[in-house]
Amino acid sequence: VMKRKIFTLLPVAALVLLLLPCASAARDIAPIVSTDWLQANLKNPKLVILDVRRVEDYREGHIPGAVNAFYGAWAYMRDGMFASLPEKDDIDDTVGYFGIDFDSLVVVTGCMDTPRLSYQSARVACTLQYAGIKNVALLDGGMNKWVLEKKPLSCRIERRASKNFRGKYSGERFADKEYIKNNLGKLILLDTREREFFSGEKKMDCIPKTGHIPGAFNMPTSCAFNDDKTFKTKEELAQIVEAAAGNDRAAAIVTYCDIGQCCPTWAYLMTQVLGYTNVKLYAGAMQEWAQDPDAPVTKNNDASPADK
């Protein structure tokens, strides 16, 4: 077993622009794009900007040309689960409705006002990649940075010509409960919740048990961001991830959280920025896991370098 080092989160002294080549597959767009890059490319005919904020926020002002692709279209309330992965046909309909195809350059942006809102864009990006869209990017700093920099805004409700989209799905993005149960002890599990939820000191009301999946390492999603909600540098991200998950880029890894909203950020960064090739996210997360009487839960913190 690879020895994992304790990590500490270092404050960032300066804002760093993260424009990184994709580490996992050929791309025509960086996995994280700056507000300056996006402004310079607004006229690109292949560009599709997905604004995942609430419609009322979108109507108050959005990036010119952006369509309102509310987060709720990408993560359903189903069978008591707050953020279930939609069926493939539903994903196809949503992607096609927004005029996206396999040649599109898709930039996803949203509100960064709260931690959970700031994580929504990555869930949408991972779902698009699950459907076979490779050229997906996150806007560094989201709408908050765009507005702060006084870049142009539009109040026009944008509509794109829809397309008959049929996804090219693979099992590379999402894990289910049975996959984790059948591979406990073989996987590297990354619990991306804040420490007090990992340890069992706190829980969401929708989670029936406190604690975490046995053997999981705690790597909060909030650690990926600077105070201004831009992403940390590639080197800083690698330091955090390697402390918890090791540096074997081919290791089998699953990220999870409470309801499947926080964990996609690390899954996206690990595969698209840091070069990890076998990372899945568990959309059912602790909400589903803790409801299964046969799925073990522990409060033992010994497995987490962040807690030592």
Where are these regions (language model features)?
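Active-site neighborhoods of enzymes that stabilize oxyanions during catalysis
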Residues: 27-28, 40, 144-214, 294-308
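Extended hydrophobic/aromatic segments used for targeting, binding, or gating
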Residues: 67, 235, 274-306
